[in-house]
């Protein structure tokens, strides 16, 4: 296996279709939403006009068909930004219908403060959304403490076990960290209203946490060197696929890759997983520092395919719209894992009502549209579509595992080391 850890690159961390060919789709990276607020008079249910595929202008430069609307709260008039201001910009956002789900304007006002342990934060995107909520609700403040999810999870557990945490909620980039806090009984169950919009597959046991944004494992591939039909639907077949010998890349040090291997271990067992890792290494799979660089190498033609979260291909396409890059998805195995960023209420907080309303805002139509079009995440509520022709969560076929079990990482690290693919 060739080691490419010294390559330069940016660190971006973070059911199959009835058609025999798997669903895939790419879309361009979306710009920062505008922060100015205007009054809304048009219906949130309107559709944006369709535009030609060659159009280059985003919503940010167009007349806004979704004017902002005011709500009454705490004796004051509050201004809710227009839907377009929650959206990113880009050609594939144009023509998107208004999302379904509950609008912010139909939710209780936020008032008070929350101490939020942010695990990850997707490059500041989550903080940006909190700032938008603070603009809507002058009486609300979200104080964030940003650190890696695993570190935050350990800090929360230690604080609760020693007498109490100063934080109210944990917003984690992955389910493994949420699962760790839940396993150690450092949480309080979320209210039913906060859980209701999200499918049970993306909730913790006993309502311990709820997903707010999803990401799917995928196989970015170079369309000039391989056909999608040549890519197996099971990762177990990759080591023996001739077209992929010596032409694939991965990033074993990356947290998302470790979760992928953990999912395989939980589903197939440690020995089968070790053998697969060794087979992929022996097949010449090249090592890279992160999955963004893997995806760049695929687009460059340096690799035929790789293993990466779905949104890295979207970021590459933003920079290089004509890059010969697309996505394939495996079926029913670890290669099809859908992980989530989610929210957990920390044991000992006395802000139950505010936390419930805060989580409901994260699952609002506007928030889910924001996460889908700005961070390219999979929406967690049925009424919002993923961007760019990606298969919906329902069309993907992830492995049947409890996402919280991804927190059991130590055995994964041991077998990766034994296989010569240390993280």
What residue ranges belong to the model's regions?
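N-terminal secretory signal peptides
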Residues: 1-42
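Extracytoplasmic ligand-binding site segments that recognize negatively charged/polar headgroups
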Residues: 115, 119-127, 150, 165-302
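Extracytoplasmic/periplasmic substrate-binding proteins
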Residues: 272, 289-348, 385-387
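N-terminal export leaders
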Residues: 1, 42-61
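Mature extracytoplasmic/periplasmic domains
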Residues: 341-403
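Conserved C-terminal helix/tail region of periplasmic/extracytoplasmic solute-binding proteins
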Residues: 405-423
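Bacterial lipoprotein signal-peptidase II cleavage site
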Residues: 63-71
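Early extracytoplasmic/lumenal segment of secretory-pathway proteins
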Residues: 86-173, 179
């Amino acid at each position: 296996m060739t080691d490419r850890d010294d390559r330069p690159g940016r660190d971006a961390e973070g059911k199959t279709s009835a058609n025999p060919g798997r669903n895939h789709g790419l879309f361009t990276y979306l710009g920062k939403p505008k922060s100015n607020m205007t009054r809304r008079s048009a219906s949130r249910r309107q559709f944006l006009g369709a535009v030609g595929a060659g159009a280059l202008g985003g919503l940010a430069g167009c007349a806004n068909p979704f004017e902002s609307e005011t709500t009454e709260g705490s004796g004051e008039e509050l201004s809710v930004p227009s839907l377009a201001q929650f959206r990113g910009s880009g050609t594939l956002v144009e023509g998107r219908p208004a999302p379904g789900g509950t609008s912010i304007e139909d939710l209780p006002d936020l008032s008070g403060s929350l101490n939020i342990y942010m695990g990850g934060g997707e490059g500041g995107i989550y903080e940006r959304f909190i700032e938008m909520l603070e603009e809507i609700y002058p009486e609300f403040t979200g104080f964030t403490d940003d650190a890696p999810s695993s570190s935050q999870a350990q800090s929360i557990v230690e604080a609760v076990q020693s007498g109490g945490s100063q934080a109210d909620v944990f917003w984690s980039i992955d389910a493994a960290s949420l699962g760790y806090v839940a396993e150690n009984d450092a949480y309080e169950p979320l209210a039913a209203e906060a859980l209701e919009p999200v499918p049970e597959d993306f909730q913790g046991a006993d309502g311990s946490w709820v997903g707010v944004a999803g990401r799917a494992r995928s196989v970015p591939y170079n369309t000039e060197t391989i056909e999608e039909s040549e890519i197996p639907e099971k990762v177990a077949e990759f080591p023996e696929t001739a077209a992929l010998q010596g032409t694939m890349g991965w990033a074993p040090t990356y947290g998302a890759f470790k979760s992928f291997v953990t999912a395989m271990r939980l589903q197939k067992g440690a020995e089968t997983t070790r053998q697969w890792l060794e087979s992929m290494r022996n097949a010449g799979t090249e090592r890279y520092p992160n999955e963004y660089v893997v995806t760049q190498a695929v687009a460059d033609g340096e690799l035929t395919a790789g293993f990466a979260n779905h949104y890295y291909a979207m970021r590459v396409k933003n920079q290089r719209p004509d890059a010969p890059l697309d996505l394939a998805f495996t079926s029913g195995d670890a290669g099809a894992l859908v992980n989530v960023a989610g929210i957990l209420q920390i044991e000992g907080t006395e802000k139950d009502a505010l936390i419930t309303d805060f989580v409901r805002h994260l699952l609002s139509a506007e928030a889910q549209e924001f996460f889908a079009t700005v961070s390219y995440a999979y929406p967690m509520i049925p009424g919002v579509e993923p961007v760019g022709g990606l298969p919906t969560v329902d069309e993907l076929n992830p492995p049947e595992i409890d996402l919280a079990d991804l927190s059991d990482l130590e055995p994964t690290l041991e077998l990766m080391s034994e296989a010569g693919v240390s993280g």
